């Protein structure tokens, strides 16, 4: 993002924590990436700084961390209840459409900053038509909708400049992997498969564990403390183990995803981090009434299952610091597959596993669906690596945001 170095700006990013960890995680990642651009001054206003502190050790309200000033969004915050024109930043981002503090919003009329409504991520096609649209206000200000998504016609996804290079170095260093797993209390034997499980309380986890047990392969399922507390770690068939792990920082969660043969994730932030892991995963969308979440799942699947087709930007250079997503990772390939072949096509098996995990009433039972998808692990791995590779060719969300703002000036 160095092309913007000659344009120092002040940024205020507002975040109300609704989905617990995910909202804080996304806003922090964006704030940190903006702050890495020389000359940028970034404040992150967050109503629950303690949630962010769980993800980023050392974060405290009233202090700067990695170039970002963390401010507690409280009713008594002076800069929010009596802001002057100079208190308003040049660039104002409302995380996930949150309502800005009334007095700050009123002061924006004098400063007239660029105002961005950062929406939730979606892979659905309709976001391409809504991304970047203006919303003029009665006081003369304009709010712009910014939709993160997949492909070149959206706001993109968050990715640190050197993330994929760091992942490659980690995967190529067996001591780094074993040392990390050892810190979690895990010493996998040769041939041991590892799955991470981060899910909402309604996740059909018994079907997942049954599917893993039916493969006949040794699996260890890593579940964070406080997630799916009803899982009993001691009563499973031979070859299957469930192990609790401590809550991890953002950086360590990335390493966990890089270590696993299968990642089950939930929400927006962990979905994108699993994308950059380039490994087979199943995403649990936030459950909604009348299965309103299923189109979101289907939209991601369309991108995943079409990832090996030539992308629109074929031939574009990867972003700085990126590397190709490896399709031949430790633990992937034929050795991950169960002994039998799925009767369904590989792509159909992968789709059905995702839909079953997300409670699609028309999907097969969870255990059968995931079992069949694991039988298609070679294809699953290739698709996962290809989708990672396709998105890595494109500018990141932070890069697109800076370019979008420049185009409006």
Where are the language model's segments positioned?
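C-terminal amphipathic helix plus adjacent low-complexity
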Residues: 159-160, 312, 316, 340-409
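Active-site and donor-binding regions of nucleotide-sugar-utilizing enzymes
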Residues: 13-141
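Short, charged/polar "capping" segments at the starts of alpha-helices
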Residues: 49-55, 124-126, 203-207, 227-233
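A nucleotide-sugar donor-handling region in carbohydrate enzymes
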Residues: 119-203
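A short helix->loop->beta-strand "cap" motif at the edges of active sites that frequently abuts
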Residues: 111-114, 217, 279
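Catalytic donor nucleotide-activated moiety binding site of glycosyltransferases and closely related
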Residues: 216-246
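A donor-sugar binding/catalytic signature common to diverse glycosyltransferases
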Residues: 28-31, 248-296
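Intrinsically disordered, low-complexity terminal tails and inter-domain linkers enriched
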Residues: 5, 309-346
